[in-house]
Amino acid sequence: LLIEKEIWPRDKICGDAVGGKSLSHVKELGVLDMIESTPHYVVDSIVFGSANGSEVRVMLPKESYEKMGLQSGYSLPRMQFDYMMFKRGQEIVRENGGSVIQGFSVNEITVEKTEKGHKITGITGNIGGKRSGNENMTFTSALTIGAGGYNCPVSRVITEIHNEPHRDDDHFCGGYREYWDNVEGLGGEEGPIEIHFIDEVLPGYFWLFPVQGNRVNVGIGMLISEHRKLKADRKKSLKKIQKWVINEHPRFKKRFANATLVSGSEKGWQLPFGSPRKNSPSPFQPRRAAMAGAVCVGDAASLVDPFSGEGIGNALLSAKLTASHFDKDLHKDGFTEEAAIEYMNNLWGALGSELTNSKTLQKVMKWKLLTNWFVKKASKKEEIGKMMSEMIASKESQKILWSPWFLMKTLLLP
């Protein structure tokens, strides 16, 4: 049974970039051909900009990526991408004798006490929400999978039962997005996406991601804890900060002079990062995401990359991992606590290294002087650009950045 709160197609607030890691899972699900038959933007490079005005364009060469079994990535509205994924998801569910319910609000997670503790056995809710007056329905299952985003009711119950925190503002990011048409220097069917670390947005970043035609996803992301630390003269909403950047910033106001805001596209949201928690009461990283009877995937398991902000790839990986840990015969009386622990350990085993590396990169980008210096150096030294391309393609390559020999050879030497 697939239960969905919204009626599809629906908007999803996001940066709209779909990286190569995500596309490999999309291809496996049989959706890639569908995406490629619809309008989309091919990402061939990433432009990184620093506060002092330096920029470096890191190429994502298609041929090199294909040799590694990867794709450089696409950018397209999540309403479009998600609808195709949901369409395929419905087909798979129905082909296997299941059902799909849209517009269903989960009001309660059903929990039973057991000899070993607690077990989630299902959900209760109704179509249209509590105020609709519609009759409540209860569904039970050997396994309940929570995929409801940063505030997923399944993930909240899992952490509450174990008396562990669900939210940590040091690992939650606020995001704000708008769509603009005709931003200077961007558009077409293929080209760069842009990420800028500028004074007015640090310790967050400002992005420009073309999606199709002349339309561009424009947004800001910043850790919620860092946003709260801003001094009074800078403590504005992300919406107001973005408005200033677009209208007043010397590097961007000319680019937006003839651009048009798409009415109704101004929306904010939150991203639960998968960065490791220090001194956490939970024995699992980044937080507890499963228990007897239930697992969480994607944002509900707090798996968003803390540097890039991308969550699709890790969401799809966690969903695939969930399927491999559930055995309908072995778990016919309920998904066990032992299986839940194995899932969480294997999940962190698969993602922990890259999420930890990304957290380190996120922290480095807070240091304005270092970011200015690095981007300026990279813009003049081809070797650094090639290294950054490899880092984007392979998270394992990020480890090279922290090698003392690499720092001396690549950055310090002329």
Describe the residue ranges of each PLM region.
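Glycine-rich FAD pyrophosphate-binding loop
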Residues: 1-14
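N-terminal FAD cofactor-binding segment of flavoenzymes
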Residues: 11-53
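Helix-loop-beta segment of a Rossmann-like dinucleotide-binding subdomain
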Residues: 55-79, 122, 217-226
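Short beta-strand to alpha-helix junction loop
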Residues: 64-87, 178, 230-237
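Short loop/edge segments at beta-strand edges and connector loops
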Residues: 83, 102-104, 263
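Predominantly flavin-linked oxidoreductase catalytic cores and closely associated redox partners
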Residues: 88-256
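FAD/FMN-dependent oxidoreductases across multiple families
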Residues: 226-228, 232-325, 331
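C-terminal helical "tail/cap" subdomain of flavin- and related membrane-associated enzymes
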Residues: 324-414
